[in-house]
C-alpha cells in the first residue's frame, strides 16, 4: 500500500541554538540555518563529527522527521549516521536506528515523535573526508490526509536552456543551463478542519520558502526533493458543499 505525501517545513534547526564539533574554513555552522543547500557546513579532521541542537533551559524540541539535502554523505563513505536525543547533554539515546546513506541526494526519514531539550546528528569516524551538509531538517512533518488525484506525475521536469538562431531562423545550438523539477499535484476531499489547522499555518509561515517533499516515502524513499510553491497562493475552493480542494505546482532544482 502506498503512503500519502508529506512535507517537512517547520525546521527546529533554524530556531534552536546550534553547535558543531568542528568547522572548516568557509563552511560555518550558520550555513545550516536557512534553506539554501549550496551553502554548506563542513567539519575538519578525521574524528567523529556532530551537530547539536539545544532548545534552551526549560524548553524542548519535538521531532519526528530527519531531512538532509546538499550533502555528499554517500560519496565520503559515511556509515552508521545517527540521530540522538538527550535531556541532560550527557546521556544520549537513538531516535532511529543508525543508517548508511545510499545517496548524495535528498534524504527524509520519519520516526516516533521525541520531545527533548537536546538533539544531535552524529557522523562517526571512518569517512573518506569530512562531508558537507547544506540543509539539516529536524522537526515534525505535515502529512496530507488523502492521495493525489488521478494523473499525478512525480517525475515532472523541465530543462532551462538558451538557444542560438541564425539570421534566417535556423537553430545553431542549444545550451542547457539547468534542469528543474516541476511537479503538479491535486488533492480533493480535504476536510475544512485540515485546511484550517494544517495548510493555512504552513502557508502563512512558510509559503515563500523551500521544504522537503516526499510523495510516497514507504515505496519511493529515493524520491525526496527540496521544492517550493511555484505560485504562493492560498486557494482551497469548496467542492460538493463540505469538502475542499488544493492544486499545487512545486518546483526546485533537479539533482
Predicted regions mapped to residue ranges:
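Extracellular/virion structural assembly segments
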Residues: 1-50, 54-80, 89-255
